[in-house]
Amino acid sequence: MTPSIDLRTFHSLQPARQHLLDVYTDVRADLLHLPNYAVTAFAERLDRHFKEPGWVAVLAYEQDKPIGYAYANTVDSEDRWWKRITPAPPAEYTDRHVVALKEIGVRLPWRGTGIARQIHDTLLAARNEPFVTLMVNPLAGDGKVHRLYESWGYEDLGQSQPSPASPVLTAMVKSIP
């Protein structure tokens, strides 16, 4: 019998922080030498994002071991999220509150099992915003990650480079059913 997956939602960072860091470290192990992917850089972003409106995280556990995560927060028309995307996104997205999916990751043994989609959908299920946006490195997995998001209904919106150490990312958006 396959162990069941337990999805837990967190609205506070403290009880989830170490598990988020642990899974991130495992998921991004081959990139941790790059400044943007260093655990310290992720921890700084995580702490900053938690202070932003609407923060929520979902962690997946198998037998109490964290195996995947996603976290998001709300962005509005004045948020730097939108200001860094070129070309400028349509007002249809920027003139309202939307969910920004900041991070999602699943440990290697559980990739390709649908866990990422379960985490994603659980995170969005309780949201009231009409759209969700994310940024993806179009080179991740030789384009596989971008194609996965397209299969989930996301469409390209533009490009963004959130920091000088960051790769150029593709901003994507989709409606929340």
Where does each model-flagged region fall?
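A short helix-loop-beta-strand connector motif used in the catalytic cores of GNAT acetyltransferases and
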Residues: D47-L59, T74-R80, A100
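Glycine-rich acetyl-CoA-binding "A-motif" of GNAT/NAT acetyltransferases
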Residues: K65-G68, K144
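Conserved acetyl-CoA-binding loop-helix of GNAT-fold acetyltransferases
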Residues: A100-L108, G112-A125, R147-S151
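Conserved GNAT acetyl-CoA-binding A-motif
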Residues: A125-L139
